[in-house]
Structure formats: C-alpha cells, structure tokens
Amino acid sequence: MLFKKKVLATSVALAFAGTVAPAFAQTDDQLEGVDQIEIEEVIVLGGIRGSLKRSMDIKRDSAGVVDAISAEDMGKFPDANLAESLQRITGVSISRERGEGSQVTVRGFGPEYNLVTLNGRQMPTHSASSRSFDFGDLASEGIAGVQVYKTGRADVPTGGVGSSINISTTRPLDAPGQKMSLSAKMVNDTSTREGDKITPEFSGIYSNTFANDTIGIAITASSQTRNNGVNSASTTGWFTRAGDHSGAGGIPNDANQVNRSQSADEFSSIPQQIAYSIAEYETTRTNGQVVLQWAPTETLTGTLDYIHSEHDLDKKMSDLSAWFSNASASSQSSTWNDGAQRSPLMYAETHNFADFAMGLHQDGRKNTNESIGLNLEWDASNSLSFALDYHDSSAETGANNPYGTSSLVTIASFNKVASAVYYGQEMPVLVQSLNSGADGADRPLYKNDMVVTGSVFTNDEARMDIEQAKLSGVFEFSDSSSIDFGFQMTEVNNRFASRNVQLDNWGGFTQPGELSAVIDRSSMAGQFDQISGGNDPRQQTEYFTADIADVISVAEASYTARGAAYAQVGDCGTGYCASTDWNADKRSTEETTAAYLQLNHATEFVGKPVNIQVGVRYEETDVTSAALAPTYSDVYWLGGNEFTMVEALDADGNAIQAFDAYTGDYDMVLPSLDWDIEVAENVVLRASYSKTVTRPSFTDIQGGITVNSTSFKNTGADASGGNPGLVPIKSTNYDVSVEWYYDEGSYLSVGYFEKDVANFIGSSVREGNLFNLNWPLGGTLFNEAVTASGIDPLKYTEVGAYIFANLADNAAVQGDRIYGVNGDPLVSFKVQSPANQETAKVDGVEINLQHNFGETGFGMIANATFVNADVSYDNMKIDSQFVLNGLSDSANLVAFYDKGALQARLAYNWRDDYLAGVGQGAGTYTNPTNVESYGQLDISASYEYSDNLTIFFAGLNVLEETYNVYGRDKLQVLQVGQTGARYDIGVRYSF
C-alpha cells in the first residue's frame, strides 16, 4: 500500500505553502494507520469547504470506518469546543455541562466506552472513577484535526468499545516557513445574572522553521474567560411503590388520594424534595503547547512536545427547597394520572411547623493536564522505517478554594405548615404555606425567622498518570504490500481521595434574629421564563440569599458563644470549611504490555481495486488496587437483635485505617479485518470485523472493602468493595458500508454496524470473614446462658436479659454490652462486589450526505444515526435491571456558504431521549434517569477583510433551548433548566 502513504504529506505541504494558510494538518505519525493515496495534483482549499474535503479524503482513504474533522484555517477549528465539533460526525452525540459540550457518546456507547488519544498517545483523565475524557479542558485553537475510529485496528490503542478518538496537534516541519495567527474575541453569554456580560478570549499560534527547514518550532497559547448562569428546578428523587404497598414510605389509600394505583402490577411515584436553584459560574481556561522538531538527516526526525492546560471552574449558587416527609407528614393528598405507571399531577403534605430551607453554595474546581513526549522517526531503508514514541502525561483535579469541591450551608425558617407541588408543565410548581403569626394567617418571610441549620463541605482530589513507550515499524514488501508491527508498554496510576465535613444541625443551630444583618431578601420571579410553567403565579419565589462567608461567621460565633464542640472540623479548625485529611483514599495501578502485527495489501478483483488489512493485537495487563479503609477490633451485643462493630483505635484514640490491596490480571487477543473495494468509479464498498475492549471503571476495580453499616442483625454484616480481577468489556464488531464520492467534496454514505458485547459488569455477593471479628451469638457465654436457662436460642432478647441478670460477672460483659471473645464464632459478611455478568447486542444504521452546490459556494451536510439494543429499561419493574446508558438516535443538518471572502454556517444538532443511568440520588435506587430529546441551533460567519485580517461571529444555542431530565415518565421531572444563548465576535490576524 505504498501508493497510499503520501497524500497527507503532499497536501499538508501544499496547504501551508498556499496563500490561504489552511489548518496545520495531520502527520503520518499522528494519523497512524489512516491510509492515504498519492495524487497527481492537489487544489489547496481553506475554510469550510477545504476542511470538509480533507475530512472526506481521510474517510475515503482509510481502512475501516474512520470519520474526521480538520481545522478550517490555521488556529481555527469549526467550533470553539471540540465536543461541539465532534457531534457533527455521524453516530456521535454529546452531553453538555452548563450549556457547553463536555463528553461524547459514539454509536450509543457513553463516554466511559470511548478512548481518547492525543497524537496517538493514550491520555489520562481526572474523573477519578471512570475513564471518560472531558473535552471542555482543551481549547480548540491548537488542534489540527480529530479522527474517530469506529472500528478496531491492531495499531490503534485499546480501550474504546464505542470508538477511539485521536486529537492531532501541529508539527512545524510539515509546513516549512514562518506562520503566525493571532485572534481576540469578546464573548457575551446571555445566561449570566451577576457576572460580566462581556468576557475576553485570546489565542495565538506561531510556527517557523530554520536551518534549511531542518529545525522547527510551533507555539500555541490561548486564554478564555466565561461567565454563565444556569437556572433550574429539580426533584432530587422519586419513591416508587406498588399500588398494594402499605408499608413505610407508602401513600395512604384514602379519600385524599385521587386516582391512586391499587394493584400490585400498578405503580405510583412520589417526590422526595423540590428545589429551585440559581447558579452562576466563572470558567477560566489556559492552554499552551510547544513543539520542537529537528531533522538532522533526511531519514531521521525528532519531535519533542509539551502540552499544558488548566481549567478553573468557580460556582456560586442559591436555592430554595421543600422536603417531603411522605408517610411522616401530618397528612398527605394527591391526584394522579392514568396508567399502570402513575405520576402525580399534584402532591401535597401538611406539616407542624417544618423547615423551609434555603441553600448557599460556593465552591470551585481546578483541572490540570500536562503531557511531555518525545518521538523519533527513522527510515532505516527504502522499505523499512521505525518510530519510537514516549510520553509522560498527567491529569489532576481538586478544590481551588477553602470550601472544597462542593459546599452547602443551609438556612431555614421553621414556619412551614404545608407544601404542594403541581406537575404537568415543564416546570414543577412549588407552593409553600408559611405561618409563624398568632392569627394563623399565611404570611411572608421575615429575616428574624431565619436560622443556620445543617452544612456539608465535600472535598476531593484525583490524579491519573500515564507513562507509555511504543516502538513501531513498517516494512514494505512491495508497492502493494506492507506490514505494520509494534510493541508498547503502558503504566496507568490512578488515585482518588475524599472527605466530607458535615454538621447535622438540620433542626436549627443559631437563634432567630442572628442572621438578620447578613441576609438579603430575593426573588426567583422571572428566572424561568423560557420554561413552560416558569411564570406560574402560584410558585414560591421569595427567599433569602447571603454571602456564604457572612453566614459562616455568624454560625462560628454562635458555636463560640455556646462553647459547643464541632462534630467534625476542616482545615480551618471549625466545621465550616473543607478538609484535606482524607478518610477515603483509593489507588489503582495498571501495567499493560502490548504487541501487534498488521498486514496491508492492495490488489484487484475482477479489475476493481481492493484493499485488505488484517491485524492482531495481544495485550497483558496486571492490576493492583488499594484503598484506605477503617478497621474494626470488636463486636458487642446489647441483648436484642442488634450487633455493633467497634472501630479500631490507636493509643491516642485515633481511628486505625489501613490500605487493603488486591490484585488481578488478564490477557487478550484482538483480531481485526478491514476490506474495501471500489465496485464502480468513486463507489466504495467497505466491510470490517474486529474485537475491541473497554476496561472496567476505577470504581469497579478499586481495592479495599467498606463496611456498609457498623450495626447489623443476627443474619450477619454487609460490606462492599471493588474487584481488580474484572476483565474488560469485550465487543465483537461487524461493519458494512457503501460510499459514493460523486463530486468534488461531495459524497453519500450508508453503513450498518453490529456490536455483540460481553462482560458487562453486574453485581455478585460472596460470604466470608473480615477483620477476624468474634461475636457473642452462638459463642461460649451465649451457649452457657441457653443451657442454663432453657431459653429458645432464637429468642435473642430473652437470652441477653438472662446474661445481664445472671452472668454479668463474666469478662465478656462490660456494662450494658456483651462482647465477642476469642473462641466465639467469627462474624459472617456478605460482600457485594462487581462481576462480569451481562451481555448485550447493539446495532444501527448511519447515513451521511455531504453536498457542494457546484461553484455557488453553498453546501449542506445531513446525517442521522439510528441505534437499537436488545436491552432497555423496563418501567414496570422496580427490581435492579441491566441497561445500557446513552443509547439514542441522533441527527445533524448543516448549511454553509464559502466563497470569496465570506463564510457562513448554520448547524442544527438533535439527539433523541436517552437513559443517562439508573439511580437518582434519592428515592428508589433502581429508578431511571432519562434525558429528554434536545436540539440546538448554532450559527457562525466570517469575513476576510484582507489577506491577513478576518472578522468572525458565532452564536451558540441561538434559539435558547431548555433541557429536561426525568424519571419513569416525563411527569416525573428530575431537572429542568435554562442556560441561554452565547455570542462571540472577534478578529483573527494571520501572516
């Protein structure tokens, strides 16, 4: 396949030599395995059309199914956010944070199933538990292109059942000479209430070569600041019960419940808590990269690169909320919709002066990514070449302020006598009845009613380090045959540490009136005007806000005045800040050795060009995981059916914790086969077979065992832990597609894919002894009491009473406790841990049309993906069930104009409803979290004022779409919110 090796080098050189200065394109090393064809003549195109043509050429000339995005011009990617650009690719959907693209789903497989590499190198993530990459950390200005490998290949790193996504950056020797591009823009985010309406963004890229183009340097830098707001209404979780349920947490079956479900095969769900929140965010991104290249000879090139990115996110949020006590309320009333799965149209409770809570949040997080790498390429002969690549990369995250990564200080008035919530519109309508006056009439809030209640300061830090070395080579037997080979060693170290500082003063701590000087009356009226029901006049909108530091000062002064002790303290010495004295510390190490062979062969079949690529990859991985966990020394019995574990303490009374380490290992063989034939002129038929894997999450492979509760009954204790012995989730993939390249920059493709996936992770339970704990049940003293008294040994309360009355002088009896002693039975633990159990089949169809309307400058892209699976969430089950998260159809429609000095684009992206996960944070733990379908229109335009100066404009979410997250049906709102539109205007100067 030698004739496919030269197109990128040729087109890149011509592109940079051209007057239009298009993108820094990808090198052969960066696009390792993306096969190419040599062409006689290259017409250099920049802008939208040039970017789309380069992406089309990569797709056409690749083995397997590969889609790509190329920069439109030097320092100009199609979107300011990489994830926003990726969603334009067929089969790729994204999730958004604060209205901005964050993570990707490919062919129905969520972020944790997609591997992200940078210049072919596996990149670390800072998500602590999963392997999901956050594209929000990287600015797009220094990116030359992105390639999405949808089928497996032997020479592509493993880790992506959904896809492997490679991000390519600049290389100065690919485009000799001096080039520079500087840009500045103003960003107007319409969603912010308190932040600066206009924030700046700056970026620059510089590339130059010296010494007859044998030495090169490229420098990229960018700085972004953005203020935005998110206004949301949420239900923190739903309790789902069968119609015949009459136990705790149920719904009374009386006249106050209208249309309540009645039978065991009908279900009703009631909310746990309703909250309205106003959040303000300030985001700062700083990105930089330096690339140095030296080619001392025509056959040897060395590249040293360093990449650094920082992403600071600060949040201030205030909220008001109503907690529903359900069966503990004074009374309940409800009205329900019809159907087997019933949701409330109205749910109400009365209370005996319960709390009306308002939360204050102020926290922040800083993400830092660093990577340094060295690459050496050596052409040993005309037919043999080698590449040595090494990198050391890290990603870390942690708090950037004293309040930790998440904080909550609550203030409340204890004058709530009734709460009601009305569903049926997009926004749940919360109605509060407040009464603290003697006349019994509803009354507004007064400052003197407010007191400080509970608080939580959560803090964590995470870091992942990846050290990777790879030796690869290509041996060309002839112009039509070659073999790729390689050997790679990778070490991944992941650590996550955390601690909560929590004061459970939910019944109130300070005295009424102490907060009056520091709180301000506020209103949420008009803050949900884009949401149906957001301006309902019944809503509770009045509440109080404050600076969290002022409220903390009042609370700390109250503690001091009372001489009260804090239940927990943070680094500041009080209970009102975060702590870095971690009590949870989880660490994992993966060491992987891999080798691969890949045969490439070009031939003909009945006169038609055929390309075949056959490969195999072998990997061995060793896993070591350790976690810091409490240890226990004793078990005591109070005489009933409750037993309690005693945490082990040192001589100073401090808890003894130990790192509990576990190991695992696995190996795997991953074959791949790609075949394509040009069945007619410009019509390519393609078929692929491969096996790909995704490794288990770091939560699933964590070491250590955590006791679920220190109190347990006669049946034994419960605990949970990870399982480093898990093997990867493995997919067998089949792809077939037909592609018609009918004109310059235009094509139509239709593809079918199928994935048979095994080793999905479920849960298993094993029994065993932990900590060598003796308990008195069935022990020497217990049996002595049973024998002497003749009491039935199953009547634990009577046996315990006999021991206290007649055997209290035994050493095992200490006060009101009976301890287990040596020789007594060991406590049996049921330990729940992850296990490879489940299988699933996913298939789908991808359709893509890209069309240029001749020389008019107009063009369009339309694509859609339809995905199916043989597993889905069953709304008529309450028990645990296996599901696939993120599965959804998606579509894109893009119209563009690119001619002369003017470029413009309208892009509409749509994603259907999808299951985001099981569990809602509260309520029934098996309830689903679904995301409603979402469509967004973005616009952009640029005008080349001169050969050097370009003026550009962009608008994101210009229709100001809102988002909706729901439970078992759309009446069960979990969150609905509005983020607003964002507009950019700026200039770019290139020379």
Q: PLM features: residue spans?
A:
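Short, acidic, small-residue-rich periplasmic hinge/interaction motif at the N-terminus
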Residues: 26-75, 111
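Short acidic/polar hinge/loop motifs at secondary-structure boundaries
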Residues: 122-150
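Outer-membrane beta-barrel signature, preferentially recognizing the C-terminal barrel domain
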Residues: 367-369, 588, 693-751, 755-757, ...
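C-terminal beta-signal and terminal closure region of outer-membrane beta-barrel proteins
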Residues: 505, 719, 775-778, 782-786, ...
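Gram-negative outer-membrane beta-barrel transporters
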Residues: 756, 761-766, 772-920, 954, ...
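C-terminal beta-signal and adjacent terminal beta-strands/loops
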Residues: 757-759, 909-919, 942-991
